[in-house]
Structures are given as C-alpha cells and as structure tokens.
Amino acid sequence: MATQAMATLIDRAMDYSYAGEQEHFRNPLYPQGVTYTKGVRYVAEHAGGGAGWLLDKIGTMQAHPQIRTEQLTQLWSLWVTEERNWALICQDGDYHLMWAEGGSYTDFPVGHITFFVQHGCIMLTSEY
C-alpha cells in the first residue's frame, strides 16, 4: 500500500509530464539509445533524498544480456517497506521475472512504484 509520501510523489510526477511527451533525456552512462521522460526525471530528483540510483539501475541494466533481449516492454517495480528495505524487479511484457535485487535501506518513500521501459525509453506508467 502506498503511503501519502509515495502518492504525492507519483501525483506530482504525473503533473510534471503527460502521455505522449516528446522531451526525453539521456545519461551518457547508459547504453546508447536509452532515454527517460520528464516524469521519471522528476521522481529521480524528488524521491526521498534523490533517487538517481534507481534511474541509474534501470538505465544501466539495459546493457545486461537478459534485459537487453526484451526491448518491446519491460516493467520495473520498486517496493519499499516500513523498515526501509527495498526490492526492485524487472518483468517482461508477459510478467515473467527477468531480474531482481533488494537492499536493506533506502530513503525512497514507502510503497510501490512501477516504470515501463519500451524501446529504450524509461517512463512512468501514466506516460505510456
């Protein structure tokens, strides 16, 4: 269940962008062709003390052999518990698990958020 902080973050990110947004951003550390939207940029800049680590993880994982093969649709979901533990999973468009990682601390808001990656573009579900 999303906390108020997570709900507010998602709402503000959605206000910051819209479906069909044409402006995309690139990070030179990511594989060629990987971009992200204004909404994703907002989340990375405003979640907790900043969630650049999350965007970097999704972006750089696009070079991983298992992830690279699924360019049509990827779903990246982050869960954060009350204890501040986190789990990040990647599924293909048919919801088959492709990759997972977890950790014992994050300042990302408690709750759940999902991103789509389609043809190398990382976006919020509302931007799809």
Question: What kind of feature is each model-predicted range?
Answer:
Residues 1-99:
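N-terminal "domain-start" segment
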Residues 88-128:
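Short, compact, well-ordered microdomains
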